[in-house]
């Protein structure tokens, strides 16, 4: 099906696709304009292998406007499982899970009718998004299983690695009552948002078995259904809905926003429920008919096609409203088209308080694709057309600070290649000079980071550059480089982002692509987090985050101009957030020293005290007063406040 044929298919303007139960009846609606017949098949269970499995009925649907097949069945069918059987003029018959299904049975082979009022945890109606000022935002990325699967986490065994592992707020290491873990730890770290790696239903974990495997989840199966392996009971579809919402509510009670990692750029395989519903419509193809694979791990969704765009926008809105999600991170955002991303931003903004919902993504793709109809990919070259509140991960910041992610031994500014200081200077002002071929409209568009789930952890990257094979040794040089790395991106304008555990030297022992496990490699090591040397590293992160919150100009979130760069020798960098170089009482001066020796740096006029010396950090000034000049510690970020 080419672009013109796709555009000739009828468009459905309603917002009620899927199964919608009320006390009077349950309406099923499916967009399948190329079908010649559709029936809905009802079941008592999510699979035929479960006790009580039986078919409850097969009902013929009728075609209406917009290519939609519909039927209304009596009663509220909450808890009933269903599929659609679709008949095509060429004789093909496809059985599919409803693309709009809100839940499913084990392994997602049947959808489930969900009345959201019957799948709400206690207090859900009182749940509210936390009010987090733009300058105070920072993101901490974690996988649901990684968060609490460690046997030392203090989370009870049946909740480890599950949505419910986020709900207790008093866990400690081995229940010692002293060393906080999980949410108890997170609520005092100083980050504002938790980004969850995919929590929708994905294909590569066997939900029917406790040991069904591990995967990051970038293999989407049912986009509007929570992943069953994260539920305490994957067989009853209401459980995953209720427990996912309970997780969100617990994070909200701790004052934390929730960002959802979404993968609307590709389907896991070419026979997805979407593609089997309207064959030839949902995925991009090359002129020879082969599906494009710009993600490198699946078949690209054609977001530029009208009903695909509608589906993506409505799916995002569903998670934002039904689960109170506070932000969305788009995997391989460059595979989405600009108009779709802008439509998502507009739709979120239309919600009460929706302008506070974060929206950002990866401005690259993993291979070639074939956008049609003049659509532009949502990459860094399209920032002129993207809404200013659609952000992007800055790989330039990532690589200049600590080295290129695709070359293990490649060094950056903090670990042996100080000449990258030219790029670090651009990072400070969120790359708003336009010197690197892209021009953000505002600082808040730029996600400033050095580590995420992909590639090496920060600690492992620093160890690789330093050729240190013992990842568990708290090497003093690596600790200094880690602190300096954090100190840089936490004083740059933009939105700071970190991988969970970066703040305690998280290691995967050199595994740079742990997407399918084992869990032992991926789970957070809460014992390591409380080893004295790594706990001190965490304290530094906590202090730098506190400084960032206390001094809003660091973020540039209110439209502040680029910082004033101080003239310093060699590869030293210094700046003051005030663009004219003045330093009134309470203002900051920031210095980076990438050298392994102490260096002298001149100070702006005035009297200064440290709030960070590269080892300790916090909002309370400490140590003596300084005027005129300051000796900077090796491999350090020093932050001073004017008296």
PLM feature segments, named:
Residues 1-23, 52-55, 64-168:
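The feature marks proteins involved in alpha-glucan
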Residues 30, 36-48, 598-614:
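Beta-strand-rich binding/interaction modules
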Residues 30, 84, 142, 196, ...:
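Conserved, mostly hydrophobic/aromatic
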Residues 145-323, 332-352, 358, 369:
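Substrate-binding/active-site clefts of carbohydrate-active enzymes
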